[in-house]
Design a protein with these regions (language model features):
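Membrane-embedded alpha-helical segments of transport systems
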Residues: 76-85, 117-125, 139-160, 180-186, ...
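Entry/N-cap segments of selected transmembrane alpha helices
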Residues: 60-90, 94, 175-179, 232-262, ...
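Single conserved hydrophobic/aromatic residue that forms the stacking wall/gate
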Residues: 1-6, 10
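Hydrophobic transmembrane alpha-helices of secondary-active transporters
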Residues: 15-20, 38-65, 83, 91, ...
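Interfacial helix-loop-helix linkers and transmembrane-helix boundary segments
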Residues: 28-34, 54-74, 133, 170, ...
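The feature identifies polytopic integral membrane transport proteins across all domains of life
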Residues: 67-75, 96-117, 135-145, 205, ...
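Membrane-water interface at loop-to-transmembrane-helix junctions
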Residues: 7, 170-182, 204-225, 233, ...
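Structural signature of hydrophobic alpha-helical transmembrane segments
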Residues: 35-49, 105-120, 175-188, 243-255, ...
Length: 337
């Protein structure tokens, strides 16, 4: 654990140094985006989730209706609990615990950024966390796809209700591109690859040999993703060290709380581990591309609200990797008699 934590610190330091000392490289990569989505980040996410998508068997997708409890847990936690606990936890810390260091105006915008993060469950990275916890690939795809559909009609009303902001709108281009880039394209590529390899060399070769060629893809992709995030956001960290820490506290507490809530409920209702782990991960992680896009549109690029969503990006990978370790250690608890 110590070596892993040290490794994470080194990756962050490398990213910050690259962004600081090679601003030209950072600027070039920053320009490679479409609809608010970073193309380099998209490529790295593809590298991480493509192996999982190859494991998706459409026959198993048809059988998900026989065990819908995992979907119900995901929907209830993500939409009826998570946005409101985020509002409560963030309000308590920004307006009460940290009032000595954060002015009311800043606290209000930090709260807005936190709520934007809490109101949209993750799309792309859930596939990575599911892979690392050996989650059910087909079930994870349905969990993510169904939540993306709910975002279309639930995100705006929830944000308006919690923040009292009237001019909230979903950047549909960002949402659409995220679904296409992180669900449709890798899923199609994975299924086509599976069909072609199985047809040519058989199921045994595909499962025992071919899939293992991609065993290190997720690890390499995660390492590069962490470096890239801290390269993009390095200046933010260096310019606002205290506020970064203060914003991170409620975000991290919320992440752990939502994970253990969903994961624990799955244990109580006796769901298998490969459904429970992704159910906990999808609620714990956030759709930060969407949150950042809305924060920038509502409050501006250099606003405290945008900074809060950026902190969500910074904390996402290290915190979720910790939850992956915890989930894997608790796997034995999901063996029922």
């Amino acid at each position: 654990v110590r070596s892993s934590a040290a490794s994470d610190v080194y990756k962050r330091q490398i990213g910050i140094m690259l962004g600081h000392f090679l601003p030209g490289m950072k600027e070039a990569l920053n320009h490679l985006e479409y609809a608010g989505i970073s193309i380099p980040m998209a490529v790295l996410i593809w590298i991480m989730i493509y192996p999982m998508m190859m494991k998706v068997d459409f026959k198993s997708i048809k059988n998900i209706g026989k065990n819908p409890k995992g979907l119900f847990v995901t929907w209830i936690v993500n939409w009826l609990i998570k946005p409101f606990t985020m509002y409560g936890i963030a309000s308590f810390f920004f307006f009460v615990v940290f009032k000595t260091w954060i002015t009311p105006d800043f606290a209000t915008e930090y709260l807005a950024g936190a709520v934007l993060l809490g109101a949209a469950p993750c799309t792309a990275m859930v596939f990575v966390w599911s892979t690392l916890t050996k989650g059910n690939p087909a079930y994870t795809v349905v969990q993510v796809a169904s939540n993306d559909i709910i975002i279309l009609f639930a995100f705006v009303p929830i944000v308006k209700f919690l923040l009292g902001v009237s001019n909230v709108s979903v950047p549909f281009q960002t949402l659409f591109m995220s679904v296409v880039l992180f669900v449709v394209i890798p899923l199609a590529a994975g299924i086509i690859t599976r069909l072609l390899v199985v047809r040519k060399k058989g199921t045994e070769y595909f499962e025992q040999t071919f899939l293992h060629k991609f065993d290190s893809a997720t690890t390499v992709g995660l390492l590069l993703t962490l470096i890239l995030i801290f390269m993009f956001q390095g200046e933010v960290v260096l310019d606002n060290p205290l506020h970064i820490i203060l914003i991170a506290v409620p975000l991290i507490i919320q992440t752990f709380f939502i994970f253990f809530l969903a994961f624990g409920v799955c244990r109580i209702i006796r769901l298998p581990y490969d459904i429970a782990a992704p159910a906990g991960m999808i609620g714990a992680s956030n759709f930060f591309e969407l949150a950042v896009a809305v924060a920038v549109a509502l409050f501006g690029t250099s606003s405290p609200a945008a900074l809060a969503t950026t902190v969500g990006v910074l904390t996402e990978v290290p915190v979720m990797l910790t939850l992956v370790k915890i989930a894997n250690k608790l796997k034995e608890k999901f063996k029922y008699e």
